[in-house]
Amino acid sequence: MEENDHSNRDVERQDSGDESNRAILPLLQAPGNVLPHRITNFYIDNILRPDFGRRKEGSRRDEINIVERENRCPSAPGSGQVAPVSGEGTSSPRAVNASKKTDISTDESLKSRAETGDQCLSSDSDCSQRCAAQAKQPMLWPAWVYCTRYSDRPSSGPRSRKPKKKTPTKEDKRPRTAFTAEQLQRLKNEFQNNRYLTEQRRQALAQELGLNESQIKIWFQNKRAKIKKATGNKNTLAVHLMAQGLYNHATVTKDDKSDSD
């Protein structure tokens, strides 16, 4: 009788140990069952995409499903309970049942791993399909293009380079005005009277000589520049500043140097 009582107590202790081990197994999973860390590609092409940094809804759902399945099947391969031997060469029927349960749990964990692998493959194919669809769509400018460095108005988008102007040819240049002798004599007389034309005087000359106002204005400007260059007279303000030692931009020609030598 006493031996039977001892055997019953051993079986009860074994059952309680199995239950406690099953409760601890989800916390102490094998390193092979840990969810694989998703590697992010930090290439320039990926960073410049408009959807860079956004979490995809499909990947989040897959992670949740994987966690739920791991919780349902916490046991890992190789973590089966070894049935204790209660005698020399004999084992109880409950120990055999425990070993069968561990085998079933390992099969279920392998199936769950296969399913998760299929899900990973399907998610990769979905990702490739999305990338192909995005490539067909018109390109969306990323947010960094609209910063103040590229434009004062963020809504205007990136600046576009203005096309360079073509090199001016001889045909594009304004042709020189060929004044007649009468026109030149009249312009010289007006210049001797006053070197600067008023608007009314310029309009009257244009009507009398049959010229444009711009032609008469340019002739007077060129005439003043030639006289200033020929005489070499300095401006009164320049003379005043030179007296104070604040302005002296006089240049010495080679002829002057040779004479001084």
UniProtKB/Swiss-Prot annotation:
Residues 1-24, 53-125, 152-176 are annotated as: Disordered. One of its GO terms (cellular component) is nucleus. Residues 1-21, 53-72, 100-116 have a biased composition (Basic and acidic residues). Its main location: nucleus. Residues 172-231 bind DNA. SUPFAM superfamilies: Homeodomain-like. InterPro entries: Engrailed_Homeobox_TFs, HD, HD_engrailed, HD_metazoa, Homeobox-engrailed_C-terminal, Homeobox-engrailed_CS, Homeobox_CS, Homeodomain-like_sf. GO terms for biological process: anterior/posterior pattern specification; cell fate specification; midbrain development; midbrain-hindbrain boundary development; regulation of transcription by RNA polymerase II. It holds the Pfam family Homeodomain. GO terms for molecular function: DNA-binding transcription factor activity, RNA polymerase II-specific; RNA polymerase II cis-regulatory region sequence-specific DNA binding. Keywords: Developmental protein, DNA-binding, Homeobox, Nucleus. Transmembrane segments: none annotated. It is found in: Nucleus. PROSITE patterns: ENGRAILED, HOMEOBOX_1, HOMEOBOX_2. Belongs to the engrailed homeobox family. This is Homeobox protein engrailed-2b. It comes from Danio rerio.
